[in-house]
C-alpha cells in the first residue's frame, strides 16, 4: 500500500528580482576652466560645453564639441552682448 504525502517545499532563500535602476553615466566635467581675468596659454581650454552657451570672441576658437579654447596667450575676458548672450575673448598682454 502506497501513501501519497502532500509535501510542500518552502523557499529557504527569498526570490530576488532584478531592478532596472542602479546605473548612471559618468559626469562630463563641463563648465568654465578659466575664469574672467585669468591668464591662459595658446591652446588652453577656456570653457567646455554642449551647444553654444558661451560664444567665441576675439582670439578664441571653437572645437567640434563646442569647447572654447585660446588661440593666443593672454587674459580671459567674459562679456555680455545682445539681449542675453555671453562671449569670451582673450586679450593679449
Swiss-Prot record:
Which residues are removed as the propeptide when the protein matures?
A: 1-10
Q: Which InterPro entries match?
A: Ribosomal_bL27, Ribosomal_bL27_CS
Keywords assigned: Ribonucleoprotein, Ribosomal protein
Task: Explain the post-translational modification.
Answer: The N-terminus is cleaved by ribosomal processing cysteine protease Prp.
Please list the GO terms describing molecular function. structural constituent of ribosome
One of the protein's GO biological processes: translation
**Which region ranges are annotated with the description Disordered?**
14-36
What are its GO cellular component terms? cytosolic large ribosomal subunit
Basic and acidic residues bias: where? 21-36
| Family membership | Belongs to the bacterial ribosomal protein bL27 family.
Name this protein carries in UniProt:
Large ribosomal subunit protein bL27
The protein's organism comes out as Mycoplasma mycoides subsp. mycoides SC (strain CCUG 32753 / NCTC 10114 / PG1)
Amino acid at each position: 500500500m502506497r501513501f501519497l504525502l502532500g509535501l510542500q517545499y518552502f523557499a529557504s532563500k527569498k526570490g530576488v528580482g532584478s531592478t532596472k535602476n542602479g546605473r548612471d553615466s559618468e559626469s562630463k566635467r563641463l563648465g568654465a576652466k578659466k575664469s574672467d581675468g585669468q591668464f591662459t596659454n595658446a591652446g588652453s581650454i577656456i570653457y567646455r560645453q554642449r551647444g553654444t552657451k558661451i560664444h567665441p570672441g576675439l582670439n578664441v576658437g571653437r572645437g567640434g564639441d563646442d569647447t572654447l579654447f585660446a588661440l593666443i596667450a593672454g587674459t580671459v575676458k567674459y562679456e555680455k552682448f545682445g539681449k542675453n548672450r555671453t562671449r569670451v575673448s582673450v586679450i593679449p598682454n
